[in-house]
UniProtKB/Swiss-Prot annotation:
This is GTP 3',8-cyclase. The gene is moaA. SMART domains: Elp3 (SM00729). Its cofactor is [4Fe-4S] cluster. Monomer and homodimer. One of its GO terms (molecular function) is GTP 3',8'-cyclase activity. Pfam families: Fer4_12 (PF13353), Mob_synth_C (PF06463), Radical_SAM (PF04055). SUPFAM superfamilies: Radical SAM enzymes. Pathway: Cofactor biosynthesis; molybdopterin biosynthesis. GO terms for biological process: Mo-molybdopterin cofactor biosynthetic process. It comes from Escherichia coli O7:K1 (strain IAI39 / ExPEC). Residues 8-234 form the Radical SAM core domain. It catalyses: GTP + AH2 + S-adenosyl-L-methionine = (8S)-3',8-cyclo-7,8-dihydroguanosine 5'-triphosphate + 5'-deoxyadenosine + L-methionine + A + H(+).
Length: 329
């Protein structure tokens, strides 16, 4: 095995977020309010199963322990189960997760688990069916809820739910969410609304700091848990009276980037050192053949020397991220 991926600031990288498509069938107000618009990349232009196998093999050799499959909506790929199985071939990768809108969860989650999936994140921004429809553009609330139930029935001991925190939309619904997770092993993760190139006005109107929720959780006796090295950026809180947990992802908080442990590869094979960074390092020309793995690992390691210490969101610099479907949020 090559040496562990480490940047100039001594941060070690155990976590790969791999986008496999930028296509999505939902029209979430904070991501794709006008729906998916092809950018010239057809379905045939996204990474193939073999390319995914090669890129995850290289990252596994460089110390990656966790891979999250993202999009767009990853389950829209017909070969999604094959993709899970391809990542699963790497013994060094202990966790394989997906972030999904839940559209196909009820139908397919058992097959995904059989293929090797170990974790699920489902996007649910409201527990009110009408508001869910208004936010996502899809009247699929009951279908998504049934999918979460199906995940538990398939054997997943915990399901993570992502909720984008928005002022005057859902920030006042904490009690509703807490009631939902009281007897369910769900880690509900409130994610601060982030500014993107296409979402400046939405951000100005609806952004609210997760600090508001954190203060309220602490007031109610919730306890801050320690992070594991391959965990994502959430600050996780537990309470003895609840089966579920609360996570807070606050990218505008001081020192948010200090614990960064993740890298991103887009659905067309570009390595992104930060969700809000500029450009990207092309890897695709080194994904054509198994014999290129050493060169691929070298390019990944070399690119890491250019990773910045922090993002520049506080300066209203969102980098290349025009919307969150592009490199998987």
């Amino acid at each position: 095995m090559a040496s562990q991926l480490t940047d100039a600031f001594a941060r070690k990288f155990y976590y790969l977020r791999l986008s496999i498509t930028d296509v999505c069938n939902f029209r979430c107000t904070y991501c794709l309010p006008d729906g998916y618009k092809p950018s010239g990349v057809t379905n045939k232009g996204f990474l193939t199963v073999d390319e995914i196998r090669r890129v995850t093999r290289a990252f596994a050799s460089l110390g990656t322990e966790k891979v999250r499959l993202t999009g767009g909506e990853p389950s829209l790929r017909r070969d999604f189960t094959d993709i899970i199985a391809a990542v699963r071939e790497n013994d060094a990768i202990r966790q394989i997760a997906v972030t999904t809108n839940g559209y196909r969860l009820e139908r397919d989650v058992a097959n995904w688990r059989d293929a090797g999936l170990t974790g699920i994140n489902v996007s649910v921004d409201s527990l009110d069916a009408r508001q869910f429809h208004a936010i996502t553009g899809q009247d699929k609330f009951n279908q998504v809820m049934a999918g979460i139930d199906a995940a538990f029935e398939a054997g997943f001991e915990k399901v993570k739910v992502n909720t984008v925190l928005m002022r005057d939309v859902n920030h006042h619904q904490l009690d509703t969410f807490l009631n939902w997770i009281q007897h369910r092993p769900i880690q509900l993760r409130f994610i601060e609304l982030m500014e993107t190139g296409e979402g400046i006005e939405l951000f100005r109107k609806h952004h609210i700091s997760g600090q508001v929720l954190r203060d309220e959780l602490l007031r109610r006796g919730w306890i801050h848990q320690l992070r594991q090295r391959s965990d994502g950026p959430a600050q996780v809180f537990c309470h003895p009276d609840y089966a579920g947990e609360i996570g807070l992802i606050m990218p505008y908080e001081k020192d948010f980037c200090a614990t960064c442990n993740r890298l991103r590869v887009s659905s067309i094979g570009k390595l992104h050192l930060c969700l809000f960074g500029e450009g990207g390092v092309n890897l695709r020309d080194l994904l054509e053949d198994d014999t290129q793995q050493q060169a691929l690992e070298a390019r990944i390691s070399a690119a890491l020397r250019e990773k910045k210490q922090t993002h520049f969101l506080h300066q209203n610099n969102t980098g290349i991220t025009q919307n969150l479907s592009y490199i998987g949020g």
